[in-house]
Design a protein with these regions (language model features):
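Short Cys/His-rich "knuckle" micro-motifs
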Residues: 48-53, 76-78
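Short metal-binding segments enriched for Cys and/or His
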Residues: 61-84
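N-terminal alpha-helical interaction blocks
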Residues: 1-25
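Short, flexible, mixed-charge glycine/proline-rich loop motifs
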Residues: 20-37, 56-60
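Intrinsically disordered, low-complexity regions enriched in Ser/Pro/Gly/Gln/His and often acidic
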Residues: 1, 26, 57-58, 70-72
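Short cysteine-rich clusters marking metal-coordination/redox-active sites
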Residues: 38-42, 66-69
Length: 85
């Protein structure tokens, strides 16, 4: 069980509590925006070698969560996985 004082917790409950997520491959949203970060550990998602290429995100792909942080926080945040389209 993750402790409430885990270093990765920085007010994400405001916008990530009880929301559906989907598993997705990261695709750059625009030519000028080539990466995102895990909302918890700050690991980088991008299409570049050495970065994360897939993980979990909000349905609109605004917020990304790496697989490790998803596993660590899924119970605390009560996430559900959306059905694949």
């Amino acid at each position: 069980m993750i402790e409430k004082d885990d270093w990765r917790l920085v007010d994400q409950t405001r916008y990530l509590m009880h929301i559906p997520l989907k598993k997705a491959v990261y695709r750059r949203p625009s030519p000028n925006w080539d990466h995102d970060h895990c909302e918890f550990c700050w690991d980088t998602f991008s299409e570049y070698d050495g970065d994360l290429h897939e993980g979990y995100c909000t349905i609109d792909e605004t917020y990304w969560i790496c697989p490790e942080c998803f596993a660590d926080f899924k119970e605390m945040f009560h996430w559900t996985l959306a059905e694949k389209e």
